[in-house]
Regions:
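Nucleotide-activated chemistry modules centered on ATP-dependent adenylation/adenylyltransferase
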Residues: 1-190, 195-327
């Protein structure tokens, strides 16, 4: 279950603020995940509408009663499962091919059973051992059976379909609300080529049933696969490129030193500045521009405090909207 909770009163929050009188606390994201031993996937608990604050922990597909497993899980892809088999020194390096494997901050879950992996121990490995691990990986990666992972993905989608329909409908209705006071000429999607901005693009496009302008912030440091995806994406979407053609990242590193927590020049030079220039060219006479960002509150403690709608602190005349919110 994913819901917004008031950290002061520990009650569910429907909007952006607690309903208790005088409480201005920002809601935090609360996630509850259960494990279905029958379907072998994590399941988001659902609200029981009959009983206030009661959560249902039954799998909607098989009806199995599920046990609490974690607050946050990420699927482990086939390549990582092979690497885990090597690190756990399994005799059969493809032993996890058919296993549903998930990762949390505290360890890995193999068909719901937790096993811990010492990152500290891995980081202290001699380079020679790492080379041997890489050799084993390279010898076996082509023999991975992906059918188990593909089947798991389908089971996960089926078991959590109700939840995704719910949050998708909420997000689309929220986005459509901005269409009442803004035209398509006043808005754009900030597109990075990542999964979050892709989902945001899909939501915005479905909300308005029309093509919306996308701006791709080219930092010049993107992976080749990102540029390839951007080119494919641009065939069906209007994508503009915001790029600083005058500066070179490596050269600036030589001149002023690499960017760090105390000297964060990279975003200003290669992202904010380039996007500001593009906005001035595309939205010349616009007083305010609406921007849909692919940012999720659950990504970090700092982002959990972001308002869903806010004025950009870096780019003038820009209103930023977090379309996904709790997705």
């Amino acid at each position: 279950m994913i819901e917004k909770i008031c950290p002061i009163h520990n009650v569910p929050v429907e909007g952006e603020k607690c309903s208790k009188d005088g409480c201005d606390a920002r809601p935090i994201i609360s996630t509850t995940l259960y494990w279905c031993t029958e379907c072998r996937v994590p399941v988001f608990g659902e609200k029981d509408e009959r009983i206030k604050n009661k959560k249902i922990n039954r799998c909607p597909v098989c009806g199995n009663e599920c046990e609490y497993i974690s607050t946050d899980l990420r699927p482990v892809i086939p390549e990582e499962k092979l690497l885990l088999a090597i690190l756990f020194e399994e005799e059969d390096l493809h032993v996890f091919d058919e296993v549903s494997v998930w990762n949390s901050n505290s360890g890995y879950y193999f068909d719901g059973i937790k096993r811990e992996l010492s990152i500290k121990q891995i980081n202290s490995m001699p380079l020679s051992e790492i080379h041997e691990i890489k050799k084993k990986y390279d010898l076996n990666v082509e023999d991975i059976n992906r059918s188990g992972f593909d089947d798991m993905v389908q089971r996960f989608i089926a078991s959590n379909a109700n939840r995704y329909y719910e949050i998708t409908d909420e997000a689309i209705k929220y986005i459509q609300g901005f269409g009442e006071s803004n035209s398509l000429d006043d808005m754009f999607v900030s597109f990075s080529g990542g999964k979050d901005s892709t989902v945001t693009s899909d939501l915005v496009t479905r909300a308005f049933a029309k093509k919306v302008t996308h701006i791709f912030g080219d930092t010049t440091l993107e992976f080749p696969t990102t540029y390839e995806y951007r080119d494919r994406f641009a065939k069906s979407h209007r994508v503009l490129r915001a790029k600083n053609y005058e500066k070179n990242f490596e050269q600036l590193c030589e001149e002023i030193g690499p960017p760090s927590r105390v000297m964060r020049w990279c975003c200003t030079v290669f992202k904010t500045g380039a996007i500001t220039k593009t906005l001035s060219q595309v939205f010349k006479d616009k007083i305010n521009v609406l921007t849909f960002y692919g940012i999720r509150k659950s990504e970090s403690a700092s982002r959990s405090k972001y308002d869903r709608e806010s004025e950009s602190p870096k780019i003038t005349k820009q209103t930023v909207v977090m379309a996904m919110d709790i997705i």
